[in-house]
Amino acid sequence: MDQTLQQHGPVDLAFTAPPSKSFTHRALIIAALADGESLIRGPLIAEDTLLTVRALQALGADITDTPEGYRVQGTDGRPDCAEGTVLDLKNSGTSLRLLSSIALLCSSTAGVTLTGSPRMQQRPIGELGDAIRTLGGSVRYLAADGYPPCVVQGPLVGGEATLDGSVSSQFISSLLLAAPYAVRPVDLKVARQPVSRSYLEITGAVMAAFGVPVRRVGYTHFTVQPARYRGREYTVEGDYSSASYFFALAATLGGKVTVRNLNHDSVQGDRLFVAALKAMGCRVTRETDGVTIERTKNLHGISIDMTTAPDTVQTLAVVAALADSPTTITGVGHLQYKESDRVAVTAGTLRALGCTVDISADAITIHPGPLHGGVIDPHDDHRTAMAFAVLGLAVGDVTIEDPACVGKSFPKFWNALAAGGLL
């Protein structure tokens, strides 16, 4: 059933940010490789993270969902899976990319097959595959060269590999997560400043929490020595990406919104969204365990580089549609490789609602204008659905098709809006 949004006025609301998807993925993977038992407290339970759980179970990790969180009995770096294991990661690019290197550690003599949805099979992984081969592993593509489905087989010997870094930082994160269990040290060099580099900080932070440091020089040289993760209790922090939709309610509708369960010292790149709203004219107040956004005057257009905050680009774009001057967002070229081509989809949808939008190879410019309702196809992309739901509440008569696609990262999104009296 579709979800229709009607126009709402200023708000005064409080929400709790759901757990971070990025931290949950990494904590689960590391715990599954660790020596001993781990307890992952407050994990995100959503389609993507459940796919990672099931894949790790197929690779031999004992994972139990308990009231306290996920209890994970690690494999001590030796995942054990049946011959011919196939990991169908559906539409979870994070799961497929991060687990590709973990598959190198598996005992299967036939390798591990990683596959996904039709869209997943259009998302390139050739750069990761090349690095895996350089480090001693094997990658065999079953359809198009450089794209899933593929068969990955170890060993992970180690040594030096060079990546480009311009498509996805997840290729680097994938290799880093598996690197402690290589025979020799793993030395990764990145030819260009990687996109979404804040996610590399998340990877490094979780690895360090489980006892394995990553030595790096900026974001262009990473070294991991042979080591072992140690099981532990780990609490997942709140998600700035998901919080952005609530913050955007204050920016688009007026009034104020407080989001709790946010770490002020987080390495999450999507914290930049808060600074963007401040630059556009919103008031930002730091609370004890969260942030309050308040808007009492017009929004102003800005120019901003969102390379480090890719998951909030669409949220910022819909806010920009209601400003009093144009907004240019740069650092967006790699978004074409997400669950949908987010630049093209965002531009097309804003145009359909009345905006003028210019796009180039690495930028999108939104020219505000009179907006009207319409029907939005999110292209099976959770972030498109949630971002345009926010705009729908400002414009009215906006219908989101396939609203259930938000289950990928934020299953309770619509419930949260309903609890705030917005549906």
Curated annotation (Swiss-Prot):
Which Pfam families has this protein been placed in? Answer: EPSP_synthase
Q: Where does 3-phosphoshikimate bind?
A: 21-22, 26, 168-170, 196, 311, 338
> Where in the cell does this protein reside?
Cytoplasm
Pathway annotation from the record: Metabolic intermediate biosynthesis; chorismate biosynthesis
MF GO annotations: 3-phosphoshikimate 1-carboxyvinyltransferase activity
Q: What is its EC number?
A: 2.5.1.19
Q: Where does phosphoenolpyruvate bind?
A: 21, 93, 123, 170, 342, 383, 408
Q: What InterPro entries does UniProt report for this protein, alphabetically?
A: Enolpyruvate_Tfrase_dom, Enolpyruvate_Tfrase_sf, EPSP_synthase, EPSP_synthase_CS, RNA3'P_cycl/enolpyr_Trfase_a/b
Which reaction is recorded as catalysed by this protein? 3-phosphoshikimate + phosphoenolpyruvate = 5-O-(1-carboxyvinyl)-3-phosphoshikimate + phosphate
GO biological-process terms attached to the record: amino acid biosynthetic process; aromatic amino acid family biosynthetic process; chorismate biosynthetic process
GO CC, any one term = cytoplasm
**Gene3D superfamilies recorded:** Enolpyruvate transferase domain
Active site (UniProt): 311
Q: Mostly located where?
A: cytoplasm
Alphabetic keyword roster: Amino-acid biosynthesis, Aromatic amino acid biosynthesis, Cytoplasm, Transferase
Q: What is the role of the protein in this entry?
A: Catalyzes the transfer of the enolpyruvyl moiety of phosphoenolpyruvate (PEP) to the 5-hydroxyl of shikimate-3-phosphate (S3P) to produce enolpyruvyl shikimate-3-phosphate and inorganic phosphate.
> What HAMAP family does the annotation carry?
EPSP_synth
Q: Which family does it belong to?
A: Belongs to the EPSP synthase family.
- NCBIfam families per the record? aroA
Q: How does it assemble?
A: Monomer.
Quote the protein name from its UniProt record: 3-phosphoshikimate 1-carboxyvinyltransferase
In its UniProt entry, the species of origin is given as: Methanosphaerula palustris (strain ATCC BAA-1556 / DSM 19958 / E1-9c)
